[in-house]
């Protein structure tokens, strides 16, 4: 038996993000579905006052986890142009696609051909025209530079060492002046022997050395262990 929705309201801080309240008192994040009737990863579809929303699962999306853990700055609006490194099968990019809308663009880079095909099937083939898929290696931005114009935000979520360096290298190519970067630090992908907090500091220092002002850092427990989200600007 489904639980009835009693309210959908805009998030008090974040554009394009909504809070759904159910009759049992629980609340969930959601975004307004850009492609009504279609799911991306099995998420619940919620209809309220003639509008369809997609539940945003923080255990499947590190951006949702960061928002629930108190992230104050999400530099994504309607019309934002973004480079997303490590698009995987498209869970978080799909919600960003909802937020940026038809005037926005998400250049989505994924390295694995198998995962890239899944991304295509779940997002591009389902009518998300604001998503530009790129099969490529985020370590080598020159390989896909001819596909991308300047972007407002560079977002990275890759299981590689030197995550901050990869982000900064891409920002040098594509980030507009005054633009933002969003770094998901996966500590265990960088150094399994070091405490996660030390790895976070190391990656943040790399951003600072590359000329970024670090604005906010949020740890992602309990949704993801040894992960953090960093927002910075150049």
From Swiss-Prot:
PROSITE patterns: FIBRILLARIN. Keywords: Methyltransferase, RNA-binding, rRNA processing, Transferase, tRNA processing. GO terms for molecular function: histone H2AQ104 methyltransferase activity; RNA binding; rRNA methyltransferase activity. Transmembrane segments: none annotated. SUPFAM superfamilies: S-adenosyl-L-methionine-dependent methyltransferases (SSF53335). It is an enzyme of class 2 (transferase). GO terms for biological process: box C/D sno(s)RNA 3'-end processing; tRNA processing. Coiled coil: none annotated. SMART domains: Fibrillarin. InterPro entries: Fibrillarin, Fibrillarin_CS, SAM-dependent_MTases_sf. It comes from the Archaea. Its EC number is 2.1.1.-. S-adenosyl-L-methionine binds at residues 91-92, 110-111, 137-138, 157-160. The keyword Methyltransferase applies. Pfam families: Fibrillarin. Involved in pre-rRNA and tRNA processing. Utilizes the methyl donor S-adenosyl-L-methionine to catalyze the site-specific 2'-hydroxyl methylation of ribose moieties in rRNA and tRNA. Site specificity is provided by a guide RNA that base pairs with the substrate. Methylation occurs at a characteristic distance from the sequence involved in base pairing with the guide RNA. NCBIfam families: PRK04266.1-1, PRK04266.1-2, PRK04266.1-3. Interacts with nop5. Component of box C/D small ribonucleoprotein (sRNP) particles that contain rpl7ae, FlpA and nop5, plus a guide RNA. Belongs to the methyltransferase superfamily. Fibrillarin family. This is Fibrillarin-like rRNA/tRNA 2'-O-methyltransferase. It comes from Pyrobaculum calidifontis (strain DSM 21063 / JCM 11548 / VA1).
